[in-house]
């Protein structure tokens, strides 16, 4: 099982009655991608940190659309992602979820938090990598850090080639 935070908020989109997608950015690991590729299962969990205590889970089958896949650009446009710090070279994949079950529960264990804003760190990191070595620098990072999961499942092999 994998539990990985995702975001920012503009990177998750509902595409139709049974499909959601989120923009997967380069990161320090690739657990979600590796586990989808292993068994196809995914659960997206959304928690309310303000207002009524609620948790929503979207259970389904996932598909990884890497940035170098011919479907990526069309799907990116269709989804209308609005990432405040979206650096094209750091787009790793789009995760499509065919939602087969929706469940909700109380969020009594979720702490109350006040939203302060998005963190600018991803944009700064990607821009620095681009200045130092361009897309090749990001691809080298992905090859080193994202080739496999912590339990040795294959994830990315040098992807993404920016679209």
What are these regions, as identified by a protein language model?
Residues 1-163:
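Binding-site signature for planar aromatic cofactors or substrates
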């Amino acid at each position: 099982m994998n539990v990985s935070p995702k975001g920012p908020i503009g990177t998750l989109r509902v595409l139709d009655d049974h499909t959601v997608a989120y923009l997967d950015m380069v990161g320090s690991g690739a657990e979600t991608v590796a586990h989808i590729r292993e068994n196809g299962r995914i659960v997206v969990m959304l928690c309310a940190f303000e207002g009524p205590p609620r948790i929503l889970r979207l259970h389904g089958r996932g598909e990884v659309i890497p940035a170098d896949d011919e479907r990526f650009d069309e799907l990116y446009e269709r989804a209308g992602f609005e990432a405040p710090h979206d650096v094209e070279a750091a787009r790793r994949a789009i995760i499509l979820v065919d939602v087969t079950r929706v469940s909700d529960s109380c969020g009594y264990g979720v702490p109350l938090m006040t939203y302060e804003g998005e963190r600018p760190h991803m944009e700064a990191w990607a821009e620095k990598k681009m200045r130092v070595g361009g897309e090749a620098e990001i691809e080298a990072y992905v090859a080193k850090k994202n080739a496999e999961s912590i339990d040795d499942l294959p994830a990315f092999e040098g992807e993404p080639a920016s679209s």
